């Protein structure tokens, strides 16, 4: 049942992706909305729009080419304005200011995740990254009436190192008279009271509090299943000192246990990744059955090599330059590791093919 916030005093804690979606809607309903922000988010207009029937027909005719491009692309995202787009070939610093801005404007108008791959080095070079970051901050300032509020909503960390959040009417919410931004770095939350929340030295009278404080990415859901491996070892205990895996699909000590779209998997189109990993696992099982074997698990040394490669790739990017869930920073006590494979899908596929060539990185019985 949809909650009714009409004439209610509401607080939303958190301005990540979930908070942004909630705030956009609740701002239009609540009598008063307090937005409790610790870290501002880079946002991009979602640009949802009706699909023209002619465009749908065109895309279906190009479907084979689209999938081929996606399977050979770094991230699996190859559309701009819902049409096929070539992969980037240049640094953001190799083009003129005018050409760079035109590219950013084009992708901003496209919406969604289009800016991720405008140039080859947006996540590798800080100077290149900051050209996009300042462009995004300009877009934020242009939509906020109060310049003080606008600056509080402008992130300063490298763009794309935290999730880029598509939105509709989010920034405009802060122009409404019933919406108040509370900067938790200036006035932190102290406690709940019977009437609401105390932030700084002020008590906010509230009818409802909505927590949009994120979740334990990649490992959290698997931890909660209480998966147990050899010697009754739990997966949560196995990963308590840092994430380990081989090929982002299995881990030593848990024979015949596979996952898809999980820890250490590529930052890639999740539909195509699930398809590839399912095929890999099914082919592996078929080969094992043909050889009359019924157990497989990674060898410790093979797993260590994959983990090291994953972390080395992650450390070569800008992701470690901010606190983010890609590195596990949003969960207190979680070891800081690269949780995703950031080396692109073609290189990941090469690792999988090498592993399957002779199974030398696995214990097979």
Ranges and model annotations:
Residues 22-26:
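Aromatic pocket-lining residues of Rossmann-like dinucleotide-binding sites
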Residues 1-8, 15, 20, 30-365:
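N-terminal FAD-binding dinucleotide-binding subdomain shared by FAD-dependent oxidases/monooxygenases
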């Amino acid at each position: 049942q949809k909650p009714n916030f009409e004439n209610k005093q509401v607080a939303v804690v958190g301005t990540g992706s979930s908070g942004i979606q909630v705030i956009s809607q609740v701002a239009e309903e609540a009598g008063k909305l307090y937005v409790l922000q610790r870290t501002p988010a880079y946002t991009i207009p979602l640009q949802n729009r009706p699909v023209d029937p002619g465009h749908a027909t065109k895309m279906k005719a190009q479907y084979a080419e689209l999938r081929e491009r996606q399977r050979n692309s770094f991230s699996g995202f190859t559309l701009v304005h819902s049409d096929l787009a070539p992969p980037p070939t240049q640094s953001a610093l190799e083009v003129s200011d005018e050409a760079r801005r035109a590219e950013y404007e084009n992708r901003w108008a496209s919406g969604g995740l289009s800016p991720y791959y405008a140039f080859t080095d947006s996540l590798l070079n800080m100077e290149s990254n900051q050209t996009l970051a300042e462009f995004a901050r300009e877009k934020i300032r242009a939509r906020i009436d109060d310049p003080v509020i606008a600056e509080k909503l402008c992130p300063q960390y490298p763009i794309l190192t935290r999730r880029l959040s598509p939105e509709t009417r989010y920034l405009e919410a802060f122009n409404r008279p019933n919406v108040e931004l509370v900067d938790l770095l200036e006035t932190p939350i102290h406690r709940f009271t019977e009437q609401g929340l105390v932030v700084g030295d002020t008590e906010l009278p509230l009818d409802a509090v909505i927590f949009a404080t994120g979740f334990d990415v990649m490992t959290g859901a698997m931890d909660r299943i209480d998966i147990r491996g050899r010697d009754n070892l739990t997966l949560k205990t196995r990963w308590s000192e840092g994430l380990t895996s081989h090929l982002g699909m299995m881990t030593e000590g848990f024979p015949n246990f596979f996952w898809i779209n999980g820890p250490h998997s590529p930052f890639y189109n999740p539909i195509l990744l699930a398809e590839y990993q399912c095929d890999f696992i099914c082919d592996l099982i078929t080969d094992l059955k043909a050889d009359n074997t019924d157990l497989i698990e990674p060898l410790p040394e093979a797993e260590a090599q994959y983990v090291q490669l994953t972390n080395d790739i992650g450390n070569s990017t800008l992701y470690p330059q901010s606190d983010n869930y890609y590195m596990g920073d949003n969960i207190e006590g979680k070891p800081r590791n690269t949780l995703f494979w950031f080396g692109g899908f073609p290189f990941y596929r090469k690792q999988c093919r090498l592993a399957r060539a002779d199974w030398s990185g696995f214990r097979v019985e």
